[in-house]
Amino acid sequence: MINMTNLDKSVEEEILAIVEKYQKENTKLLNYLIVDDEITFFSPIANGSEITASDLQKVADILKGSFVGMEIVNQEYRFKFKMGI
């Protein structure tokens, strides 16, 4: 079991640089939950643009893991990844 509650700030910044273009203007938030070796990112369905497969792969590469899946719950996207870091 991984006892990690937050990603390193440098990792957060790398991921935010990829996903911020999908967020509302002037909003730079990276909301996530880590459970064991899985991380779920939460992103509001605000501006109608959905993240690309290429950008999902970039996030997976940063996490040294793989993209597991996506779902929409309560007006937000939830992206789940397996982590290798």
Where are these regions (language model features)?
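Disordered, low-complexity tails and leader-like regions
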Residues: 1-4, 41-50, 79-81
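Short, flexible coil/linker elements and helix-boundary hinge sites characteristic
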Residues: 23-27, 64, 84
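Acidic, low-complexity, intrinsically disordered interaction modules
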Residues: 29-74
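An N-terminal amphipathic alpha-helical segment
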Residues: 1-40
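Polar/charged, Gly/Pro-rich intrinsically disordered segments
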Residues: 69-85
